[in-house]
Amino acid sequence: MHFNNKNKSLDCLNTKIWPSPAKINLFLSVTGIRKDGYHFIQTLFQFLNYGDYLIFNTTSDKKIKLINKIHGIRNENNLIIRAAKSLKDFMWKNKNHDTPGVKIFIKKYIPIGGGLGGGSSNAATTLIALNEHWKCKLSLNTLADLGLQIGIDIPVFIYGKSAFAEGIGEKLSLFQPKEKFYLIVIPPIKISTKLIFNKFILNKKSYLKSCNQYLKKPLKNDFEPMIRKNFIIIDNLINYLSKFSNFRLTGTGSCIFSEFDSECKAKEILYKLPNKIKGFVSKGTNISYLKEILKIRSNFNVLS
């Protein structure tokens, strides 16, 4: 769902509802592979004005429940549940603070296995929302540390600012790229990040670069050649869409995207997508909608 500035006042007042924004990787370079399988990367994260919504209702039974299951993901493996349990355990072990239970409902719009960070974003929103609802009073740094134990991409969603990421993705430096319009194309397949990491072979000598050095050249994603080779539908889509603009992969896929200076131009190409191929147009944002909502709620004390 698109986050609309016209609805921002309503989103701020209904404190049970929290946005969970998508992200894109404007570029992604693999610079090495650790013995444990983790990949050293350099990438630039930017948020989209589009994403999921999570609804939180605290309960007295101290149980954590996800009301609507996400197809293909067992509840115990869901990052929302893992994030909530992580915060609950941390508060008990480190603060001797017994938190209440919670029922969580998700309105899912970010495609699963699309490289838009839906699971990581959901986990980050859960940590931030429950930090407020349970009155944990933890800092963003502490929440980011908790998130990092669950998923590498979670901290960038906790901080809510576009960033240049290094290491295995955990070293973040603030960076503000231009806020352009993006056409996101959603192929009808899901791609497992773990599967791609296991298959990826680093066959080049990579050098660490600054973010500005990457931005001086055409942007690319090092996972794209392998994914195009293994998923013919993505290769065909990129070939077809290259008639209109330069498209590239975000994350480990499956979604591909292109950037535009105007929303009108992006929508013009959206309407040229092949039948049964979905997509949407969104503005890139350097401050996530979640961070905006949290700031406004805090300023107006609507969370107290």
UniProtKB/Swiss-Prot annotation:
Task: From the UniProt annotation, give the residues forming the signal peptide.
Answer: none
Protein name (database record): 4-diphosphocytidyl-2-C-methyl-D-erythritol kinase
Q: Which HAMAP family match?
A: IspE
Top-level EC class as recorded in UniProt:
transferase
Q: How does it assemble?
A: Homodimer.
Q: Mind telling me which Gene3D superfamilies this protein's record contains?
A: 3.30.230.10, GHMP kinase, C-terminal domain
Say yes or no: keyword Nucleotide-binding present. Answer: yes
Q: Family per UniProt?
A: Belongs to the GHMP kinase family. IspE subfamily.
Which residue positions are annotated as catalytic? Answer: K23, D153
Name the species this protein comes from: Wigglesworthia glossinidia brevipalpis
The record lists the catalysed reaction(s) as: 4-CDP-2-C-methyl-D-erythritol + ATP = 4-CDP-2-C-methyl-D-erythritol 2-phosphate + ADP + H(+)
Residues bound to ATP:
P111, I112, G113, G114, G115, L116, G117, G118, G119, S120, S121
UniProt xrefs under Pfam families: GHMP_kinases_C (PF08544), GHMP_kinases_N (PF00288)
